[in-house]
Amino acid sequence: MEIYDFIYKIDSFCNYSNNWNIIQDSYTNEKYGYFADKRPIEVLIKNSIINADKPPGPTSHEVAYWIKQMFKVSKAGHGGTLDPKVTGVLPIGLENATKLMSYISSSGKEYVCLMQVHCDFNIDELKQIISKFIGIIYQKPPVRSSVKRRTRKKKIYDIEILDTDKRFILLRISSDPGTYMRKLCHDIGVILGCGAHMRELRRIRSGIFTEKNLVTLQEISEALYMWKNCKDESDLRKILLPMEYATCGMPKILIDDNAVDAISYGAMLTAPGIVAYQRFRVKDTVAILTLKGELVAIGEADVDSQKLVDMKKGIVVKPKRVLMPRDIYPRSWKKHG
């Protein structure tokens, strides 16, 4: 089926692999909704994510606002704040896709950081000091911070020295979201004994979004011009990622057309509505999709997927975030009250 090819593209986006288990044969009625990778451009815009390359200068909110104005949409949100001087990966969700930004914001980050130390140093000693910061660290946000200044526990997954030039060190750092790179550089300098500070910072990954398909504001502007003035939407389609790509790494469940509308109203997903699924465990975050690949909701698994084979009824997933607008698919349930 075409749907599995589309989901394979999504999962390949972050090298995720999870086999499918088919419970029942079903088909989707093309009268309702759209195949997620073939939405009309106007519909795609309202259900897409742009992997923007934030320039130095503006705030993350300003970049999101500019893109909102460019597309003339009612909402745009970003997936993780970058300071004005910081550049790099800034996923922007448009309209319906803004509901997914919290999942991106709470995912791991990766940076390239230029640190300057305040004295000559021995590279082996520096490597030893840096290695001590891999793992759990404790940070207090800087004085000029938008959050409450309390000590926070963060995890540094890896720090790699990419290059050195006199007192300048280029680092690649993988960490929890909300880790302060400026503070990390300062603390490394304290242990070194002579001080250090961050000179430049670029984010190269936010969750599953990397530099691989970054687009600049200029490229967005040019693609919009070609669509509006030359009726050529090809460049715009390369820029607009269907919001379903944000589910890469999540186990997925495909549901029957008759179950879609109830879920869009916030109903629990029960066993009879499931057509196919990837393996998941209790409490896992699961993506619920139509047979056209449209994201209906993201929820929490109430059972282990191994139980699905024998389940004839009962709750499987409790939706936490509904993305499918109501009444797109036909109603096959009775509304009470």
UniProtKB/Swiss-Prot annotation:
Disulfide bonds: none annotated. The keyword Lipoprotein does not apply. It comes from the Archaea. CDD domains: PUA_Cbf5. The keyword tRNA processing applies. It comes from Sulfurisphaera tokodaii (strain DSM 16993 / JCM 10545 / NBRC 100140 / 7). The gene is truB. Residues 250-324 form the PUA domain. This is Probable tRNA pseudouridine synthase B. Belongs to the pseudouridine synthase TruB family. Type 2 subfamily. PANTHER family: CENTROMERE/MICROTUBULE BINDING PROTEIN CBF5 (PTHR23127), H_ACA RIBONUCLEOPROTEIN COMPLEX SUBUNIT DKC1 (PTHR23127:SF0). GO terms for molecular function: RNA binding; tRNA pseudouridine(55) synthase activity. The active site is at D83. Its EC number is 5.4.99.25. It catalyses: uridine(55) in tRNA = pseudouridine(55) in tRNA. Could be responsible for synthesis of pseudouridine from uracil-55 in the psi GC loop of transfer RNAs. Keywords: Isomerase, tRNA processing. It is an enzyme of class 5 (isomerase). InterPro entries: Dyskerin-like, PsdUridine_synth_cat_dom_sf, PsdUridine_synth_N, PUA, PUA-like_sf, PUA_sf, tRNA_PsdUridine_synth_B_fam, TruB_arch.
